C-alpha cells in the first residue's frame, strides 16, 4: 500500500503546476520555500505559500527559538522579503546586547533595593482582628442607650436598677 501512495503523490505533483522555490536556509539547517500563486488542473487559483522544512522532522522535537524570528515573520507574511543571513546575525547580536544590559540593570536595581531596605526599620508585626469589611473589631458589649439608626440600629439593653424600692 505504501508504493501506491507514493505513485499517486508523484502523479499528483506532475499534474500540479506547483513550483517550490528555495529562498533560504538558517543556521539550524531549516530550509525555507516559496510557492507562488498558481492555477491547478481544475482551474482553481491556489494562493501563494511560504513553507519551512524543519531540520528535525517531528513536531514533538520543536522548541521555541528553533526558527529565527525574522524567518517566522516571513512565513507569517508580516514581512515581504526573506531575511538575509547578515540581517539575522545583526539582530541576534542586538538581542544579546539588550539581554546583557537588562541583566546589568537588574543587578544594579537589586543592589539599590538592598541598600534602601537596610535604611528602613524592620516591619512591625501587626495583629489582625476580624474581617476587613467589619466596621468594629472589638468585643460587642451591650449599652443602655440605643446605637445608630436605620439598618445598623441596635436597641438599648435593659439593666435592672438595684435600689429603687422594690418590694420583696
From Swiss-Prot:
Superkingdom, taxonomy of origin: Eukaryota
Compartment(s) where it occurs, according to its Swiss-Prot or TrEMBL record: Mitochondrion
GO CC annotation: mitochondrion; respiratory chain complex I
Biased composition (Basic and acidic residues): 108-118
Keyword list, A-Z: Chaperone, Cilium biogenesis/degradation, Mitochondrion, Phosphoprotein, Transit peptide
Biased composition (Polar residues): 144-155
Mitochondrion found in the keyword field: yes
Stretches the record annotates as Disordered: 108-168
Modified residues (Phosphoserine): 133
Pfam families: NDUFA12 (PF05071)
Family that this chain belongs to: Belongs to the complex I NDUFA12 subunit family.
Protein name listed in UniProt: NADH dehydrogenase [ubiquinone] 1 alpha subcomplex assembly factor 2
Gene: NDUFAF2
Amino acid at each position: 500500500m505504501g508504493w501506491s501512495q507514493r505513485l499517486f503523490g508523484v502523479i499528483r505533483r506532475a499534474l500540479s503546476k506547483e513550483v517550490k522555490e528555495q529562498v533560504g536556509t538558517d543556521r539550524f539547517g531549516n530550509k525555507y520555500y516559496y510557492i507562488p500563486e498558481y492555477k491547478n488542473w481544475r482551474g482553481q487559483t491556489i494562493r501563494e505559500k511560504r513553507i519551512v522544512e524543519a531540520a528535525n522532522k517531528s513536531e514533538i522535537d520543536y522548541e521555541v527559538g528553533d526558527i529565527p524570528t525574522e524567518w517566522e515573520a516571513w512565513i507569517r507574511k508580516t514581512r515581504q522579503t526573506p531575511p538575509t543571513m547578515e540581517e539575522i546575525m545583526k539582530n541576534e547580536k542586538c538581542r544579546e546586547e539588550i539581554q546583557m544590559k537588562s541583566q546589568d540593570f537588574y543587578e544594579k536595581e537589586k543592589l539599590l533595593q538592598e541598600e534602601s531596605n537596610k535604611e528602613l526599620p524592620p516591619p512591625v508585626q501587626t495583629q489582625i482582628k476580624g474581617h476587613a469589611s467589619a466596621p468594629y473589631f472589638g468585643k460587642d458589649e451591650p449599652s443602655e442607650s440605643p446605637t445608630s439608626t436605620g439598618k445598623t440600629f441596635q436597641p438599648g439593653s435593659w439593666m435592672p436598677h438595684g435600689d429603687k424600692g422594690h418590694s420583696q
